[in-house]
Amino acid sequence: MGRKYQIISGDGHVETPPDGWLQYVPERYRDRAPRLIRLPSGADGWLVEGQPMLHNGQNIKGRGPVKFANASYFNADGSPREGAGDPIQRLHEQDLDGIDAEVLFAPVFVARFIESISDKAVYRSIVSAYNTWLAADYCSVAPDRLIANALIPVSGLADALAELSRAKELGFRSVQLQQFPNGSGAPKPEDDQFWALSLELGMALSPHFSFGGAVWRGDPRADTSQWSFEAAITQHAPMSPAATLAQLIVHGVYDRFPELKFYFAELNCAYIPGMLYYMDRNYHEFKDWFGVSLKKDPSEYVLEHTLFGMVRDAPVLRMGHLVPLERFVWGSDFPHSVGTFPTSTQQIKDMFEGIDEALRRKILVGNICAHLGLDPDADITDTPAS
């Protein structure tokens, strides 16, 4: 009997220098791709078209001190820091932390900041290169333990559909969204093609903590007469992913696609009971003015279609009378600054005190396996020696 899943982190981050995926960017576009430079302080900075200098900081903490800037992917001797190395190093870091697998999200430098690149062909080539490298050179070492999300471009529906299909061909189980499939911060009817294809392909949707833009509240200097209904029902519930959920609900996405599910990671989940309460209260308070009638309360839609990712969220595990704990997934957020590395097992023990074993298993293994189509009882890849 081999190694089994005991703890899966539903929230890890690929924080590596860009050299690996840059090789997959077509040569004609490579000079427009992001660059990592060494600063006089010894820290790293990112040069991305259309952005100011971007500093490594909270994204590469590992078990070092928290830094908001002046951090590096490299130790003083030039070796990779914790969380910034190759996939074998990452597997050893899982072992050190006492976990068996991670769901991996793209670094913010690739996921969001490259959206400022003006030439969309260049932008698309970078997204494609990152996904190719991730599948071919990183996750392939142990695809049952390094379970990454392919990144979906924000350059329009056609590009989103193409990369979704390519992600399936590359072997990904899940994709990460930054905007709605149409490429904007708001849903459009054409997005239905993407939702339908994701279900057809069996591709999970894991957009980190939100996607899309803020709900429209009009001129910030004006009164509430310009508010959208999404803005009204998220009043007093401003944290992610309330705006995304409100847009999906109000635009009928869940009614048209009752099988659609989303996993939102790293949510700091103790606020979720309040978010659900205010969304329901506001819906009943404001629906007549807006002339909106939903088939269900907002909280019902959310709980039927959403998994919530928790990190260091002990309070939410004491709120089972307010929100179903069966909808949660634990994550370490490694190597980011709010993470639990390398003491995840102790923190889990402390957080889950008094939680029955069946529920603990769902939060640590079962829910994320069901979302990704993994067998929770399968033998998994052992860590290579080097």
Question: What does each of the following model-derived ranges do?
Answer:
Residues 2-6, 19-73, 77-96, 100-101, ...:
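Mid-to-C-terminal alpha-helical segments outside catalytic/metal-binding sites
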Residues 7, 71-82, 95-116, 146-153, ...:
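Divalent metal-dependent hydrolysis catalytic cores, especially in the metallo-beta-lactamase
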Residues 10, 40-42, 105-110, 150-155, ...:
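Short, solvent-exposed turn/loop segments enriched in Gly/Ser/Thr/Pro and often Arg
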Residues 12-13, 333-334:
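Active-site metal-binding loops of divalent metal-dependent hydrolases
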Residues 95-98, 109-137, 157-166, 185-188, ...:
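Active-site loop-helix segments enriched in His/Asp/Glu that coordinate
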Residues 108, 115, 120, 272, ...:
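Hydrophobic membrane-embedded alpha-helices
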Residues 117-119, 223-234, 344-349:
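Short glycine/proline- and charge-enriched loop/turn segments
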Residues 125, 144-147, 152, 156-158, ...:
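Catalytic pocket-lining loop regions of alpha/beta-barrel enzymes
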